[in-house]
Amino acid sequence: MATKEKKELNPRCQWTKFAVATILYLLFLVWVESWWGLIVVPFIFDVYITKKIKWQWWRESPNDATRFIMSWVDALVFALVAVYFINLFFFQNYVIPSSSLEKSLLTGDYLFVSKVSYGPRKPQTPLTMPLTQHTLPVFDCDSYIEWPQWKYERAKGFGHVELNDIVVFNYPAGDTICTAPQYQAQDFYRLAYGLGEGAYAQTHGGYLPNLSKMTLQQQRDFLAQMYADGRRIIDSNPSEYGHIKARPADRRENYVKRCVGLPGQTLQIKNRIIYLDGKANKEPDNVQYSYYVKLRSQMPLELMDELGISMEDITSLNTSGYLPLTNASVKALKAHKDVVESVTLVNDPTTWDIYPLNGNKGWTRDNYGPVWIPKKGATLKLTMSNIAIYERPIRVYEGNDLQVKDGKIYINGKEAKYYTFKMDYYWMQGDNRHNSLDSRYWGFVPEDHIVGKPIFIWWSHDPDHSGFSGIRWSRLFRFVDNIK
């Protein structure tokens, strides 16, 4: 013990520790380009050299209980600060909560997500409890304090988001939520529009007007009224919906999807196939679509396991129903003629809940666009036919006031015929194409929402099986880049 204390007090040893710690810290400051951090250097000097501040005062306390309790507090605080720092700048854990990326990434996959692949964001909401996204467990309250809010900046990374990368990002439409637990995960805007349109239909014989017969200004005014009415319904029913609350960009729910469109590209979906600048983009190997399956008898559990059909997928299936299937699964299912009567691809003509919600484009999830994806520094001509698509990036993500009056567009009080974007945007979709809430429903993902890149699956457990039988051994430490 005496030898250890002597070593700790050895001036040469202390100066060496100080030099190493300071060099590493200065390199970190160079990387994140944050010179405010230099104010910490005198404190590092004090820890190793001058020791004027009693950083561990409790060690000298005569009270055993004080020393015991404070030693645990010290260890806990150090651990939380270390975890906060590592998660913020280097990597974090992410678990796949739904089947939107199946069969590429499965429900129950735990991902190692790298922040340095695309460069970590500097703190935007710095006063946040480590190991939480937005809510404190048990207490069910915010795990962050909204003040201060720092502007978006990103340190340099090893690369940029590339086409077909699987990406973790903050859910863009999560900027506004209902605080009632059963509604927090829902798209607030789809909920508000749906409630407003439902209320309108109730007072008009169950029908909505034919938007295609309206002018673009009339369409816009009608849909704006539907949203306002829906929001009013939510606001006036706190017992059902809770309160309407805004969340900062970095405190919104984390999503994981595949990037299928890059800044500056023109995307169009034709008969389920994604085209970029007129060329078909390769589908993921395990892309899934919904099929209507008619059975002759109940599907055996062995066949479900063989085809990778989860209980989440089959909840609506009795003797007939809908299943998300890969091409290989469709062929295998059709081969079991003793169980399966027919398998038919589902064509959903629904247009009302497709982005943009404030404009009538007549697009569906399988036939969408064309739509140009905004690029930083690129200038777009604004028209009444495209303003519904780009209003959200201009107004919400880039912080401008946008108004449309008498067919004219005003940005920050001035008539605008062009707009130059301040950020890059991306188009994200799930590989489970008919069971994924993605850019087709809520639009572009701005660059300041990008969290990181999944590197590998460090753990995987099938939620349909318990104990060791649910461990997917073949997926452990599988690299995500190898999942195409």
Roles of regions detected by a PLM:
Residues A2-K484:
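Extended hydrophobic leader/signal-anchor segments used for secretion and membrane insertion
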